[in-house]
Design a protein with these regions (language model features):
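Short amphipathic beta-strand/extended segments with alternating polar/hydrophobic composition
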Residues: 56-64, 86-94, 117
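Sequence-level detector for tyrosine residue identity
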Residues: 5, 73, 80, 112-114, ...
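Generic alpha-helical secondary structure signal
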Residues: 9, 82-84, 118
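Ampiphathic alpha-helical segments that act as solvent-exposed interaction surfaces
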Residues: 99-142
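Short, internal acidic amphipathic alpha-helical interface segments
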Residues: 67-107
Length: 142
């Protein structure tokens, strides 16, 4: 018997995998998934001062949708925010860029700016580490 695909369960598994990866990252001080029984969001508190960057209340929020079918593209966003800025790496349809992958950023009351982006990682755990590396570089060079 073949198991039927459930996009909600697949999304939950992807988020749980991302949560576990972020819990192992030395910058993440607390990582929580909501709601616990069927994750739709992960929030990580980040100690970015360990990277030599002074920011207040730094968080990374992760959303993941595995797609309606096993062959569908996964859609995700890893979105960083603190008292000064918010930006993120996203993979979903967006009218401002060609393709699915993009980086978006907003400072203050200004609207978002968008840049196309490709991702090297092929699974949620690897992608979580890739995003944390991108985040480190982004904060270091600001």
């Amino acid at each position: 018997m073949v198991d039927s695909y459930n996009s909600s369960e697949a999304s939950h598994r992807a988020l749980r995998t991302s949560q576990q990866a972020l819990e192992r990252h030395p910058i993440a001080t607390a990582v929580q998934g909501f709601p616990d029984d069927n994750l739709t969001e992960i929030r990580a508190d980040l100690a970015v001062e360990r990277w030599g960057t002074e920011r207040g209340s730094a968080t990374l929020t992760v959303h993941w949708f595995a797609g309606e079918t096993p062959d569908a593209y996964s859609e995700f966003e890893f979105h960083y925010s603190d008292g000064e800025t918010d930006f993120g790496w996203h993979h979903h349809e967006q009218g401002h860029v060609d393709g699915r992958g993009h980086f978006q950023e907003r400072t203050g009351d200004a609207g978002y700016t968008y840049e196309p982006r490709t991702f090297q990682a092929q699974n949620p755990a690897q992608l979580s580490w890739e995003i944390m590396s991108l985040l480190s570089s982004k904060l270091y060079f600001e």
